[in-house]
């Protein structure tokens, strides 16, 4: 199989539950061409957006928000959400760097992990509802289209957040101490500046298409939040691992939706100035 097709296919095996099959050869190709992360995110975003579009026509808002959350994790899996719980335990652990890393890698879930996970899920639900409510006031009958495009941008932003945090991070343990690097370290090692820029430009283009310049704001916001997560990971653990990358995915998605909701609120109140909303 062509190396690009293998990397693209492996992206779905690695970042979703779509049963395309995955092998170490495929993972190696994906890590060499890790700019496929936002490309895979775009395809997943189309699927999630389609469910949002159809669901907005059929279901009441709160029901659709809950169903959308279920579909997001049905199609993307819970691996990245597990990263939130591990990061939460590590952040809440007291003591030395070694104790924090031990809590990070502990397979049991503590209070910090449970709390972080609950807060993330509540914020995801709230951000979807906020886009629905503010979007209904701004776009009226075009709300299903808005929901489609918002969920699309959120998923592209989530995957580019992973690429962003990996591109600027250093692995735990350092490369020179890695006998057999894990998937997190492989992601960091593959996220070169070149691969980051290719993915970033692709993500910016596809997020520009639905809303024009406004579509870039949630995308850029998610990438900036990924760097904040990286900063906190350095402060607590002295580096980055797969849990931090997964956390960037989850928080990046929520960040994009929150920014979209805020922009809709500002638009409703007449504070958007010369910026105009566009719908494909």
Swiss-Prot record:
Its cofactor is Mg(2+). GO terms for molecular function: adenosylcobinamide-GDP ribazoletransferase activity; cobalamin 5'-phosphate synthase activity. InterPro entries: CobS. Its EC number is 2.7.8.26. It is an enzyme of class 2 (transferase). Belongs to the CobS family. This is Adenosylcobinamide-GDP ribazoletransferase. The chain crosses the membrane at residues 4-24, 39-59, 61-81, 108-128, 196-216, 255-275. The gene is cobS. The keyword Iron-sulfur does not apply. GO terms for cellular component: plasma membrane.
């Amino acid at each position: 199989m062509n190396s690009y097709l293998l990397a693209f296919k492996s992206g779905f095996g690695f970042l979703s539950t779509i049963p395309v099959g995955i092998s170490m050869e495929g993972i190696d190709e994906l890590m060499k061409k890790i700019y496929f992360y936002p490309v895979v995110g775009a395809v997943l975003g189309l699927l999630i957006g389609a469910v949002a579009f159809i669901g907005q026509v059929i279901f009441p808002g709160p029901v659709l928000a809950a169903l959308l959350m279920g579909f997001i994790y049905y199609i993307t899996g819970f691996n990245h959400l597990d990263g939130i719980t591990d990061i939460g335990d590590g952040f809440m652990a007291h003591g030395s760097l070694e104790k924090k890393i031990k809590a990070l890698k502990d397979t049991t879930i503590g209070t910090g992990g449970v709390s972080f996970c609950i807060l993330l899920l509540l914020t995801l639900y709230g951000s979807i509802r906020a886009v629905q409510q503010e979007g209904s006031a701004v776009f009226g009958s075009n709300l299903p289209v808005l929901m489609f495009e918002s969920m699309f941008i959120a998923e592209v932003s989530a995957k580019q957040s992973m690429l962003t945090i990996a591109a600027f991070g250093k692995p735990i343990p350092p490369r020179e101490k890695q006998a057999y690097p894990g998937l997190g370290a492989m992601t960091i090692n593959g996220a070169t500046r070149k691969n980051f820029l290719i993915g970033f430009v692709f993500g910016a283009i596809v997020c520009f298409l639905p809303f024009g310049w406004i579509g870039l704001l949630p995308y850029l916001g998610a990438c900036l939040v990924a760097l904040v997560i990286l900063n906190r990971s350095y402060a607590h653990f002295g580096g980055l691992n797969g849990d931090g990358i997964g956390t960037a995915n989850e928080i990046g998605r929520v960040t994009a939706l929150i920014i979209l909701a805020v922009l809709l609120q500002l638009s409703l109140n007449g504070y958007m100035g010369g910026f105009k909303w566009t719908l494909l």
